[in-house]
Amino acid sequence: VLCCREIPAAWESTEVLGEPIIAYGLFLKLGEGNAERTEFAFASPHIGWLPTQPNAALRITPDLIDLASLGMDVSLFDPVRHLNRKPITQADRECFYQLLATVGKADVHAIQSHATPTVDLAPLLQDPTQQHGRLMIVHGTARRAIKILVDDKDIHERFGIDHYYQIDVFIPLGDHAVRLGKQTE
């Protein structure tokens, strides 16, 4: 038995059976048992979800399955889904650094084979919650690169990340037009 204070948001409204998980559990005690089964009790602050099958009702896309296969806890997107159209903040921290670490250790050829060939702006703007974790190839012009130092000791220890770069990229629109503002009928 794993006791935790939070579960993936999708699990709150459905029965969960056979879903792969990962958790850092502290052993509490040996619980009840018999000759066929022994119960172990663990406490954990968080349970990570590593789904293996897409499920539109649970917002699990093929892209999230690919990330989960690399060890990325896709439940970390739960708080991010509510923060679209806002700056990156502390609430995005764990998901952000796990994404950097996961993509950083992945095989480049495997990533390229799963990537969408170009960034399609329409779905990113219209329905960003369905795009989280989508792997895309970004073609554009780098206008500025800023080195961001990471001072968090736990990020250094867990992921080996002491810096990253923030690159401002201009993406060519080609024949596409982007309309900002309200659409009148």
Where would I find each of the regions flagged by the language model?
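OB-fold and OB-like single-stranded nucleic-acid-recognition modules
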Residues: 1-185
